[in-house]
Amino acid sequence: KIQFLRGFFSLFVFMFLASPVQAQTEGSLNLITSPLPISLTAEPGTSISTDLKIKNGGLRDEELKITIMKFRAYESSGKPQLMEREDGDIFFDWVRFSEPTFTVAPNEWKTVTATFDIPKEASFGYYYALVFSRAEEEKPQEERQTALVGGTAVLVLLEARVPEAKRQVEVAEF
């Protein structure tokens, strides 16, 4: 009887204290980026480059693309809010990539260079979100199905430092 209770207790401990294992499905997109975030400073009329590193943590080769968005901070939390290009957002045109699309194998790191060609009329700050996602998203196989489409973003703050520019902040109320 004691042997039975020990066995039962051991089984109980094993079943309830063992951590669950989550399997990654073959179709899962698992990307890791570095560095986060990136802060660049350059003078108008020059170019500046930075390396973007991405790792495929998935189980299969992934063909990826880089798209450009912009970001701002949510008012209450300060977390980034990604936004699409709007009319007048010409700073999107300043960015080029060494490889806008590429393939990365499982567990492999890939480095892509982003170059910002800053025009002479640029000034102050520009907020980019460089988004890595699948080049061709998988579409649902059957009718009335939905799919979650996503990626991961590297946030880039580009400061165009104008030598004669004057920065001034006024506190209206405290």
Task: Please describe what each predicted stretch is.
Residues 1-9:
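Bacterial N-terminal signal peptides that target proteins for export
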Residues 2, 21-23:
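Intrinsically disordered, low-complexity regions enriched in polar/acidic and amide residues
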Residues 25-35, 59-114:
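Surface-exposed binding patches on compact interaction domains or structured appendages
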